[in-house]
Curated annotation (Swiss-Prot):
The lineage of its organism: Archaea, Methanobacteriati, Methanobacteriota, Archaeoglobi, Archaeoglobales. Pfam families: DUF5320. Keywords: Coiled coil. It comes from Archaeoglobus fulgidus (strain ATCC 49558 / DSM 4304 / JCM 9628 / NBRC 100126 / VC-16). Residues 24-60 form a coiled coil. This is Uncharacterized protein AF_0667. It comes from the Archaea.
Length: 61
């Protein structure tokens, strides 16, 4: 049985069956994981920007 874009052999079978999920669910979770990672990065950058703004205001006084 072929899975997604894979061929016969060379690890494709493990890729297809190792998660126990169909391909569309596996790729959706990767998309969700990337979205969560980007949201965390956004939050960290916003917090860092606020620290920079506070430091600038402190130095202007």
């Amino acid at each position: 049985m072929r899975c997604m874009r894979g061929g016969w052999g060379r690890g494709w079978k493990r890729r297809c069956y190792s998660t126990g999920k169909p391909g569309w669910m596996r790729y959706e979770s990767e998309r969700d994981e990337k979205l969560r990672m980007l949201e965390r990065m956004r939050d960290e950058l916003e917090a860092e920007l606020e620290e920079i703004k506070r430091e600038i205001e402190r130095l202007r006084r």
